[in-house]
Every structure is written in C-alpha cells, then in structure tokens.
Amino acid sequence: MKKLTKRARSNLLNALVILFTIVLVIYLGAKNGDIGDAYRALRSARTPWLLAAAGTWSMFMVFEAMGLHVFFRQQKLKVPFRTSLLVSMIGMFYSSVTPAATGGQPMQVFSFKKRGVPTGLSSSGLAVKFFCYQTALLALGGVMWLVHPGLVADCINRGRVLVATGFVLNGVTVALVLLLAINKNIVRGIITLLIRAGKALHLVKDVAKTASRADAALVDFHASVDMLTHHPVRLLVLLGISVVQVLGQMSIAYCVYRAMGQSAAAYSEILALQVLLQIAASFTPLPGASGAQEGGFYLFFQDMFPESKLLGALLLWRFFTYYLTLIVGLGCVIGDSADSIRRRKRSPLEQPEKGDLPIEPEETQREAAANLRNPAAPATNNLQETERENS
C-alpha cells in the first residue's frame, strides 16, 4: 500500500478536523434533543433573508477582491478584476482548510505569479489588504464597544479570555505588519534565517539564487508599500474598501437572525456580537477556527434566539460564513487547475489566457519595481551580501 505524502496527510487531517466539528455539533444537538427543533427551524427559515445572507456573503467576497484590484491599479499594474476575484476565492478556500488560515496567502501569491504578477507586488498587496482588514475589524469592534457598552461588557464577562486574547493578537498582528512594512532590515533578517533553515533541511539547493529571487521580491514589496505611505489617500481608499468588506461579512449574522423569525434586537446589536466573535475566534489554530466559532456563537448569541432555534441558527450561520466559502472556493480551485492542465496540453508555449498578464522575465520585474520606487535608484542584492558576510 502506497504511503501518503506529508501534504496528503496534512490535508486529510484538516478535513477530519472539519468533519469532526460538524459531527460534534450534530451530536451535541441530538443529545440535547435539539435536532428536531433545528430541522423545523431550518424549514421555516424566511427565504428573503436567506437571499440577503447570500448577498452579504457575495458582498464580502467582491470587496475582498476589490481591495487587491484597487491596490494593483494604484501600482500601475493592470490586473483584470475577474483574476483578483478568482485568486481571492482560491485563497479563501486554502485559508479555510489550513490551520490558522496559513495556506491562503502563499497560494494566492503562487496563483498571481502564474498570471504574471511579480511576487513582491502580490505579497505587498496581500500584506496591505490584511493590514486594512484587521484595522477595520478592530476599529469596528471599538465603535461597537462605544455604542453598546453593556452588551459588549456582558459578552466579555462570558468569554473574557477569548475576547481579550482576540483583541491582543489582532492588535499585535497589525503592529507587526506595520513594522515589517517599515523596517527592511527585519524582513531581510527573517528571510535570511528562512533560507538558512531551508538549506539545513535540504529544501533550498541554491542559496545564492534563492536569495537573489527573495531580494527581488523584497524590493517589489517595499517599493509598493512605500508608495502607499507617500500617498495616504490611497491607503484610506483601501481602508474604506475593507470597512465595507467587514460590514458585509459581519452582516450575515443579522440576516440569519431575521431568517429565524427574530426581530427584537437591532442590527447594531447583532453586529456588535458578531464582531466580538470574529475578533475572539479568528486566531484559533484550527481550519476555519473550527470549534471556537461554533462555541463562540453559542456563548454570545444564546440570548438572541429561542432555545428551539439556536442550533438551527448556528448551522445556518456557519453555512454562510464558512461552508459556502469552502464549496465555492473548491469549485474555483478545481476550475483553475483544470484550465491550467487544458492549456498545458494544448500548447506548452501558449501565452496566458486573455485578460491575464504576460509572465515577464525576472530582470523585467526588477526594473518595474525599481521604477516604482525610484527610476534612478540602483537595485542592490542585500540578501546575497548578508549570506556572504555570514559565511
């Protein structure tokens, strides 16, 4: 019997974690006698509000892609919106099936590279988008705290450790992204350590070549981030897009609330609870924050739904916030893979599909990055120099 590869074992483990969470929720519901109630609640769910939930999910995904699309436009890089949307969905899928969402951004960088987007530019775009999303989430959490202090205080009392940890980790992450974007030496040192580790683990064969490519990507990264720091209006535009994106994602809970026939709580109250839940559970080191999201929903929303509808609301909410992304994202991954295979079979030398960027030589990408930064600035290979000094 052929042994599974390390990647296959990892994928299998992640799938089992997701499946275990589903089974556990159903088991607990059955044990408490809630399955029948959940079934009746789901059958009686109001269709207009289910469509609204699908609409807010679509809004979340469209503005996820819009942030990348606008960033590339700001960098004078014409990436079609459909490419940004497809790659965003691919990234969402891999984020959903890997622990702590660690697989999303690397796959997005790889997908953009296949379409001719320099690695440094796509990396900086994803970093800026991540920074804007986390900032928008924390800012919205702060606003909700001011608007509904009693409701937030009650949630904190119920899940003090979860909420406090979530705020701290999100805040530290934002600060870390800022530090990495500003301080080139820290980033360069981290990359050097990673290359050394890769060499020691026999993952990196040619240290000089790897360092050269990493340095070229680093030049692209800081050139595009520097451009944003010198044009704060552009950064504010990206922040505005992220605010709309977060509102779309957080509004799913209100649509589910109304779909279950509830109307006593105001939109802002449900929004406050959902934002707190997202902040508290987002850094759980399991695929899709499984377990923390479901437990947090019970913890924060138990007073918003009748007991007979709570499990049904949880299942419906989890479908729109997680499983729908898995389904659509998987479709995008399969479609993209099938399209790549089809094009390779048709002609190994075929150009990228219409609308994609031509894949440029590494030297051309370096020149483009240098022009973004300063047309007269010489490109330096600091990583190689660091390697020579250390050796």
PLM feature spans:
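Transmembrane helix-loop-helix hairpins in multi-pass inner-membrane proteins
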Residues: 1-40, 91-206, 286, 290-391
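Membrane-interface helix starts
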Residues: 11-12, 43-52, 226-240
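A short amphipathic helical element positioned immediately N-terminal to and/or at the very start
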Residues: 36-44, 112, 217-229
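Hydrophobic alpha-helical transmembrane segments
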Residues: 50-54, 81-86, 162-167, 235-240, ...
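Membrane-embedded helical hairpins/re-entrant loop segments and their flanking transmembrane helices
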Residues: 65-89, 256-273
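Alpha-helical transmembrane segments of multi-pass membrane proteins
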Residues: 82-91, 268-279, 308-319
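Short, membrane-interfacial amphipathic segments enriched in basic
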Residues: 200-221
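Transmembrane helical segments that form the transport core of multi-pass membrane transport proteins
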Residues: 222, 227-276
